[in-house]
Design a protein with these regions (language model features):
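Non-catalytic, usually N-terminal nucleic-acid engagement modules in DNA/RNA processing proteins
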Residues: 1-81, 85-87, 91-92
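Extended two-metal-dependent nuclease catalytic cores across DNA- and RNA-processing enzymes
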Residues: 89, 93-188
Length: 188
């Protein structure tokens, strides 16, 4: 869901590191972060181009990007475990409705995400990459996986992972070979 001004508050804890900092690590990845950001980017591009960008050209943009991001993680020697959001808590329904531009949402089923997760999971399976479904918030399961020692870090743009107990969070990951990423380490 995100916390207002979270990144400004924790900015002293953030350092920029090469993506190779992830090498050899097991990392829980919040899949919704990539799906939603790619879908938002396409919506902006289509809006700015006055819908001249055809839907066919952008329909599977998130799948294409997922492929290249996973490929980069694997090249770095990362063992990713992708985590999918489950049912949204009632507290989040108002926020989801606002993001979708609708008056209200009756359940936390996350139909939009589930529809886009299916082809992502097919791609991950074809690449031999593990994924799992959270019962509710993916960030919560990512943090739990780290706390239990199953993964070394979390890869997400959502600070909720820290609030759920993650102590090593990476964000701003790119498939580009020389890209830096942001690392936040926090002992709570």
């Amino acid at each position: 869901m995100g916390i207002n001004n979270f990144w400004e508050i924790v900015s002293p804890c953030i350092e920029r590191v090469p993506a190779s900092d992830l090498s050899g690590k097991k990392v829980a990845v919040d899949l919704a972060w990539w799906v939603v950001s790619d879908k938002q980017m396409i919506a902006r591009i289509q809006s700015e181009a006055k819908n001249t960008v055809r839907n066919k050209e952008t329909k599977n943009f998130h799948i294409r990007n997922l492929f290249y991001r996973v490929k980069r993680l694997l090249q770095l020697g990362v063992q990713p475990i992708f985590v999918l959001d489950g049912v949204a808590p009632d507290l989040k329904l108002k926020t989801i409705a606002s993001r979708l531009g609708v008056g209200s949402v009756k359940s936390g089923a996350r139909t939009f995400l589930r529809r886009h997760f299916e082809p992502c999971c097919q791609l991950l399976e074809s690449m031999g990459v593990t994924w799992c479904q959270a019962s509710n918030e993916a960030e919560k399961l990512c943090a739990a996986l780290q706390a239990a020692g199953y993964v070394d870090a979390v890869l997400s743009a959502d600070g909720d992972s820290i609030c759920f107990g993650a102590t090593s969070l990476y964000r701003s990951f790119s498939s580009e070979s020389d890209a830096e990423i942001e690392k936040e380490s926090m002992k709570i």
